[in-house]
């Protein structure tokens, strides 16, 4: 080996330093300093020479032990922007602790729109300085928030608040589907001439922008919610919204709320269909619809369904949502595989009013024809202090109506309806024939050869089978399907019908010989 010593310099690879976000300062250092300060105040001091966030042990943060370091780093880097988004949502949704920030935003918007040209002409150069100054204030605010809330629990709570406020902000649009957007687009295109006339004659573009902006910025304000709720009680307002947007936002079909739970169950059933479109469970599913009848006492008039404009409507569901009266109540829309039908013939009054009234065991708990004052719970003028007895201090009352419906598959429903309609139609037709004194020849038809064949074989003719289908309210396509799948049932019903006609003829033969001779000729 050579005696010359060679100095070897080791060069280690280093990762390029990632760009730290400027807003709120260096997030990692700010949070680390806050954690060290909290530890020092709590008497738990540890050496953190390398300054890594992962080596800071915080007793109040159990999430650190279960959260991967990669996720923790991502949350820490996202934390300043979550604070910024949370403050923006506070202002827009009017949910902050200080409501005046939202009011200031509204005033700033109005001033900018009304005096935009003047502001740009005389104060445009100062606007850039104002933006930089606002950014500096925002940077200091975020840095202070990072120092006061440096744990993962604070980040998780902030993410939850941002999620809830985002849902509030987007709540007017989450219920709009693709078809609703298409309908809104068509309506907007059709109303384009009216829009042009309004912007040309009545509202200039600046005024229109001001009105639309104020409506959007104050949509979630408390007084705006109250005003919309009061205006929505007027039918003319609901009709105006319907004709302008083309959307039924609960104004025309006001009973949407009562079907909310039912629609969720129907969607759940539809999702359980297999690849052949057949439900795994063919049993009908029953729903009990509940309507509450509300009345108010008027001096000199008595109990009437006329309610005050700001309170509940004469008919509501159990959640006080507006609902139709029993006479105007209709079942939800049918689907391709499921249909609705009533189990109870009529609406029945719940005499117990959902258990609030004790009913003797000898008395029925429901009644289809109650008296005008049965089943009511009485309240004071503000719907408080419920009582089973009426008194001079009671000015409002309500009672509970129930009716059960069931949801069945289309195939099961068609078979049951067809059979019931067929039986009732056959019985009705035989009764009419017996009343009118028709002979068996007139009933079976004029084709003698086909009647003789039917007599020999003991089966109905094709003409009679079609006649039964028409009597059962079956269309042509349904008749073809039943003719191929349920032919034996039709033939059996026809034989029963023929037997009934012959039995009636024999009975009339004993009472009237003329009818007997005509019947023998026909047979």
Curated annotation (Swiss-Prot):
Pfam hit, one: Pex24p
Modified residues (Phosphoserine): 52, 420, 424
Cellular location(s): Peroxisome membrane
Name of the protein in its database record: Peroxisomal membrane protein PEX30
Keywords, sorted A to Z: Acetylation, Membrane, Peroxisome, Phosphoprotein, Transmembrane, Transmembrane helix
Region Disordered: start-end pairs: 429-523
Biased composition (Basic and acidic residues): 448-469, 478-503
Any Gene Ontology biological process: regulation of peroxisome organization
Lineage: Eukaryota, Fungi, Dikarya, Ascomycota, Saccharomycotina
Cellular component annotations (GO), alphabetically ordered: cell periphery; cellular bud; endoplasmic reticulum; endoplasmic reticulum tubular network; peroxisomal membrane; peroxisome
Organism: Saccharomyces cerevisiae (strain ATCC 204508 / S288c) (Baker's yeast)
Listed Polar residues bias regions: 433-447
Family: Belongs to the PEX28-32 family. PEX30/31 subfamily.
PANTHER family registered for this protein in UniProt: PEROXISOMAL MEMBRANE PROTEIN PEX30-RELATED
Residues annotated as transmembrane: 91-111, 118-138, 184-204, 207-227
């Amino acid at each position: 080996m050579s005696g010359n010593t060679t100095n070897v310099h080791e060069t280690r690879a280093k990762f390029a330093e990632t760009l730290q976000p400027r807003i709120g300062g260096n997030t990692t250092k700010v949070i680390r300093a806050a954690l060290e300060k909290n530890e020092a105040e709590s008497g738990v001091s540890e050496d953190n020479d390398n300054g890594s966030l992962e080596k800071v042990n915080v007793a109040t943060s159990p999430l650190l032990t279960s959260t991967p370091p990669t996720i923790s780093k991502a949350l820490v880097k996202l934390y300043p922007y979550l604070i910024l988004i949370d403050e923006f949502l506070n202002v827009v949704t009017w949910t902050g602790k200080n409501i005046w920030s939202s009011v200031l935003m509204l005033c700033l918007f109005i001033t900018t729109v009304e005096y935009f040209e003047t502001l740009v002409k005389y104060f445009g150069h100062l606007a850039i300085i104002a933006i930089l100054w606002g950014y500096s204030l925002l940077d200091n605010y975020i840095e202070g928030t990072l120092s006061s809330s440096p744990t993962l629990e604070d980040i998780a709570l902030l993410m939850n608040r941002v999620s809830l406020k985002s849902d509030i902000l987007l709540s007017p649009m989450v219920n709009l589907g693709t078809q609703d957007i298409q309908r809104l687009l068509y309506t907007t295109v059709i109303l384009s001439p009216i829009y042009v006339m309004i912007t040309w004659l009545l509202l200039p573009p600046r005024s229109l922008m001001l009105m639309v902006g104020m409506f959007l910025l104050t949509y979630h304000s408390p007084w705006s919610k109250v005003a919309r709720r009061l205006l929505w009680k007027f039918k003319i307002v609901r009709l105006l919204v319907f004709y302008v947007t083309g959307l039924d936002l609960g104004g025309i079909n006001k009973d949407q709320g009562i079907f909310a739970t039912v629609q969720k169950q129907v969607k759940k059933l539809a999702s359980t269909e297999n690849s052949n479109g057949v439900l795994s469970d063919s049993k009908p599913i029953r729903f009990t619809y509940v309507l509450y009848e509300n009345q108010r006492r008027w001096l000199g008039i008595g109990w009437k369904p006329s309610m005050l404009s700001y309170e509940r409507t004469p008919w509501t569901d159990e959640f006080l949502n507006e609902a139709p009266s029993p006479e105007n109540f209709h079942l939800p829309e049918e689907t391709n595989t499921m249909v609705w039908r009533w189990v109870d013939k009529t609406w029945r009054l719940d005499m117990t009013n959902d258990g609030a009234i004790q009913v003797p065991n000898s008395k029925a708990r429901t009644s289809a024809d109650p008296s005008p004052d049965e089943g009511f719970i009485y309240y004071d003028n503000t719907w408080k202090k419920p009582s089973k007895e009426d008194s001079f201090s009671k000015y409002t009352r309500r009672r509970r109506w129930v009716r059960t419906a069931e949801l069945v598959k289309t195939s099961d429903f068609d078979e049951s309806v067809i059979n019931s309609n067929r039986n009732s139609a056959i019985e009705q037709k035989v009764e009419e024939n017996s009343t009118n004194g028709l002979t068996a020849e007139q009933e079976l038809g004029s084709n003698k050869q086909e009647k003789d064949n039917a007599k020999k074989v003991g089966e109905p003719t094709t003409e009679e089978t079609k006649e039964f289908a028409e009597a059962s309210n079956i269309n042509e396509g349904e008749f073809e399907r039943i003719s191929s799948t349920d032919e034996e049932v039709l033939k059996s019903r026809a034989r029963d019908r023929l037997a009934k006609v012959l039995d009636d003829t024999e009975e009339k033969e004993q009472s009237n010989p003329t009818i007997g001779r005509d019947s023998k000729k026909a047979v």
